[in-house]
Curated annotation (Swiss-Prot):
Gene behind the chain: ndhH
Domain of life: Bacteria
Biological processes, Gene Ontology terms: photosynthesis, light reaction
Signal sequence bounds: none
The organism's taxonomic lineage, starting at the top: Bacteria, Bacillati, Cyanobacteriota, Cyanophyceae, Synechococcales
GO molecular-function terms, A-Z: NAD binding; oxidoreductase activity, acting on NAD(P)H, quinone or similar compound as acceptor; quinone binding
Subunit field text: NDH-1 can be composed of about 15 different subunits; different subcomplexes with different compositions have been identified which probably have different functions.
Keyword Transport: yes
Subcellular location: Cellular thylakoid membrane
EC number: 7.1.1.-
Protein's recorded name: NAD(P)H-quinone oxidoreductase subunit H
Length: 394
């Protein structure tokens, strides 16, 4: 008796660019063989706004408000890297107090970034309840930002070459300590609700596995790299700002799957709380912007034509001239390594301003880890990468 053989034709399906689970206007052209993913082609560029060219036609103080719109979940990180590049090129020293304030803002942003990742990721895999919890905690961080900078999520415009825009208001550090005391037990609640949930673990364990060598070869960074067994964190490696003053550990796992990436981000929130508590206790006194302080001491009749006095934080001109030279500077954001390659030519605007977005690099490995996966796993794997398309497309 002959047995009938069935032959399936591959089917091409478009996910996005306006799918509710796409984490932005990302389009995936997926080739399916039944329920199995055969191929995947990401289509990006829907949010391209020419940020690098805008940077090359703006002074630094004019460009800082732009960058928080690239990655709205990591605005402080991009503000920091945009001012760090000309600072290092011009060898400008940042006061210790300003460095501590920067570290506090960056760690608050790291927690807010991971919370914004956690809620939608759990919603992608079917857990709706934590989505509402994370916004409760993020609102407290936004309240702290609003008290210090005047804005909540984006357009904080707080970082300046040589320091920060203004000092912290009276009582702000106590409020930050209260947040740390309140948020610590909330992470325990998340873990009790999520981490050992058998449905959640069976849903994502073993999904999207990335090996150690593969992560290095694809230039992954952040939780994507650390979840693959590489304990690499630029706060420890590059010793920028004042992170050497604090005691904290690098969060990393060995499995390299979606569950490992979840564990890394949960532990990073705990480590950020540890850094915040130490920074609030150890923050020194002194000026928050050395250029403003020196100008005040000199008075109106002082020599304002020198290098240190070219930058006026509250006005566009006279402004800071970026000296001749080029360098690449980087820092560890919630998504990984973000960096800026700057080339100055002794002008108020840079000759070249190249931005490296962490999620742009991390997204490149998506087609390779999707091959062989099921259709239902596409959103879980994509969600574990943590992608914001504003910074991917720039």
């Amino acid at each position: 008796m002959t047995q009938l053989e069935t032959r399936t034709e591959p089917m091409v399906v478009n996910f996005g660019p306006h799918h509710p689970s796409m984490h932005g206007v990302l389009r995936l052209v997926v080739t399916l063989d039944g329920e199995d993913v055969v191929d995947c082609e990401p289509v990006i560029g829907y949010l391209h706004r020419g940020m690098e060219k805008i940077a090359e036609n703006r002074t630094n103080v004019m460009f800082v408000p732009y960058v928080s719109r690239m990655d709205y979940a990591a605005g402080m990180f991009y503000e920091a890297i945009v001012v760090n590049a000309p600072e290092r090129l011009a060898n400008i020293k940042v006061p210790k107090r300003a460095s501590y304030i920067r570290a506090i803002m960056l760690e608050l942003n790291r927690i807010a970034n991971h919370l914004l990742w956690l809620g939608p990721f759990l919603a992608d895999v079917g857990a709706q309840t934590p989505f509402f919890y994370i916004f409760r905690e993020r609102e407290m961080i936004y309240d702290l930002w609003e008290a210090a900078t005047g804005q909540r999520l984006i357009n904080n415009n707080y970082f300046r070459i040589g320091g920060v825009a203004c000092d912290l208001p009276w009582g702000w550090l106590e409020k930050c300590k209260d947040f740390c005391d309140w948020f610590g037990p909330k992470i325990d609640e998340y873990e009790k609700l999520i981490t050992n949930n058998p449905i959640f673990r069976r849903r994502i364990e073993g999904l999207g596995v990335i090996g150690k060598e593969q992560a290095i070869n694809w230039s992954l960074s952040g939780p994507m790299l650390r979840a693959a067994g590489v304990p690499w964190d630029l706060r420890k490696v590059d010793h920028y700002e004042c992170y050497d003053d604090f005691e904290w550990d690098i969060a990393w796992e060995k499995e390299g799957d979606c569950y490992a990436r979840y564990r890394v981000r949960i532990e990073e929130m705990r480590q950020s709380l540890k850094i915040l508590r130490q920074a609030c206790e150890m923050i020194p006194g002194g000026p928050t912007e050395n250029l403003e302080a020196q100008r005040t001491v000199e008075g109106k009749k002082g020599d304002l034509s020198g290098f240190d006095y070219q930058y006026v934080a509250k006005k566009v001109a006279p402004t800071f001239k970026i000296p001749n030279g080029e360098l690449y500077t980087r820092l560890e954001s919630g998504k990984g390594e973000i960096g800026v390659f700057i080339q100055g030519n002794n002008d108020v605007t840079p000759w070249r301003f190249k931005i490296r977005a962490a999620d742009s690099n991390n997204l490149q490995i998506l087609p390779h880890i999707l091959k062989g996966a099921k259709v239902a796993d596409i959103m879980a794997i994509l969600g574990s990468i943590d992608v914001i398309m504003g910074s991917v497309d720039r």
